[in-house]
Regions:
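Peripheral, non-catalytic segments flanking oxidoreductase cores
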Residues: 1-159
């Protein structure tokens, strides 16, 4: 096995192709990575490179918008929308007792893209609200939804 300072790269190609023994092998690698490193990269996942690239480009385009445009999509009570720099503080540490600083991260949170007449949206079910989409970013929604669907498909194949 690798040193704990290296982030493991798990190649799913054989597993996704259904090769004999691949399930047991990738399970062992995943278990090691999760228990000993805490992080891992996935390769051989079958998500088209052009979709990954288009998604990164869509993200760059969103984050390049003026702050006012992004704040018009401020994260709501469903945790859907934009969270600007300094909008959150990590409180996860049970050991650190010093002053906590705000996170220097900006993020745009989305959920499964549900239609406006979906029962969870109509009934305002917590964390199941409608996504907030920026205006004027051609292809942003389509690219983002395609990527989320690809990731969901990958996740389901790994269950």
């Amino acid at each position: 096995m690798m040193a704990k300072t290296e982030i493991p790269v798990l190649n799913l190609a054989d597993f996704l192709a259904g090769k004999p023994g691949a399930h047991a092998a990738i399970t062992k690698e995943l278990q090691y990575a999760a228990e000993n490193v805490g992080f891992f990269f996935i390769d051989g996942h079958g998500v088209p490179r052009d979709l990954v690239d288009a998604t990164f480009e869509a993200s760059r385009r969103f984050h390049a918008l003026d702050e006012a445009e992004k704040m018009a999509l401020k994260a709501n009570n469903h945790n859907i929308g934009y969270m600007g720099h300094g909008a959150s503080i990590s409180r996860a540490s049970q050991v650190y007792e010093g002053e906590r600083k705000t996170n220097l991260v900006a993020a745009f949170f989305l959920k499964r893209d549900l239609p406006n007449d979906h029962p969870d949206i109509v009934n305002n079910k917590r964390f199941r609200g409608a996504n907030q989409w920026p205006e004027g970013l051609d292809g942003f929604r389509e690219t983002t939804v395609a990527y989320m669907n690809a990731m969901e498909g990958l996740a389901k194949s790994m269950l």
